[in-house]
């Protein structure tokens, strides 16, 4: 696996180019502002009725409609939600592409699952910061950066990789390290991680732990602190130094209990289910399910959101967080 740093990337591959960032959400604002402050020529493409137009202009960015931004640009970064990209690509992006343009993405979903099939006469690249947009922005303003993944899906001009590296450098990512991968690997590992560990597995583990304590007669407040609130302290240790750092930092009692009881929870049956989840990502079943869900008006997702919001851990959590002055503003 190739890893690149600042000396391996050169902004000259973007200098003199017109760069359009489509979208101004978490990632969009970070990409647009970081590249602009890296000395590049950037505009933001948004719907005319978007509430983000005023925010982008207030930040000193030029704002155009999506279609006009694409017409103007040499390099187009699509940072719109996955489920909207296909329709906007077909109606506002594809008709305005020119030979030699570069299409860029921060996640490979629509390319990998062929929701978007660009013409062969354009570059297709990915630059994926491994961090939420607000951290991409904050670390840049502090003179640092977050690690990025890059991938080249199509190289029409012969310098697509150089453009991707330059973009990562403009974001600040080359200070932390830029890892070269493929659209396929980024998409499949990203989706699996979200579903099995980060957003799915961890949330269900938290709820199950909370429910177990409450059903055994313990106060909801104690269950919340033990199963959700303190998780941040543990995750911070993982983040800073891996599993070993966590084990070193906790008590011997906690370390022994975790090492002997953890495997009783994450059994071979759980790992087998993880493999099934990965297979659904790999063969496109999850992508089809999600696209069908979007087309149905999010009926299942709406119900799941409501159920999650009404879970007792959310009610007691809101009450307890109101006691934590450092969290109120967030």
Curated annotation (Swiss-Prot):
GO MF term set: ketol-acid reductoisomerase activity; magnesium ion binding; NADP binding
UniProt pathway annotation: Amino-acid biosynthesis; L-isoleucine biosynthesis; L-isoleucine from 2-oxobutanoate: step 2/4; Amino-acid biosynthesis; L-valine biosynthesis; L-valine from pyruvate: step 2/4
Cross-referenced InterPro entries: 6-PGluconate_DH-like_C_sf (IPR008927), KARI (IPR013023), KARI_C (IPR000506), KARI_N (IPR013116), KARI_prok (IPR014359), NAD(P)-bd_dom_sf (IPR036291)
Catalyzed reaction equations: (2R)-2,3-dihydroxy-3-methylbutanoate + NADP(+) = (2S)-2-acetolactate + NADPH + H(+); (2R,3R)-2,3-dihydroxy-3-methylpentanoate + NADP(+) = (S)-2-ethyl-2-hydroxy-3-oxobutanoate + NADPH + H(+)
GO-annotated biological processes: isoleucine biosynthetic process; L-valine biosynthetic process
Positions of the catalytic residues: 107
Transport listed as a keyword: no
GO cellular component terms, A-Z: cytosol
EC number: 1.1.1.86
Co-factor binding comment: Binds 2 magnesium ions per subunit.
Protein residues bound to NADP(+): 24-27, 47, 50, 52, 82-85, 133
Keywords: Amino-acid biosynthesis, Branched-chain amino acid biosynthesis, Magnesium, Metal-binding, NADP, Oxidoreductase
Family: Belongs to the ketol-acid reductoisomerase family.
Protein name per UniProt: Ketol-acid reductoisomerase (NADP(+))
Native source species: Prosthecochloris aestuarii (strain DSM 271 / SK 413)
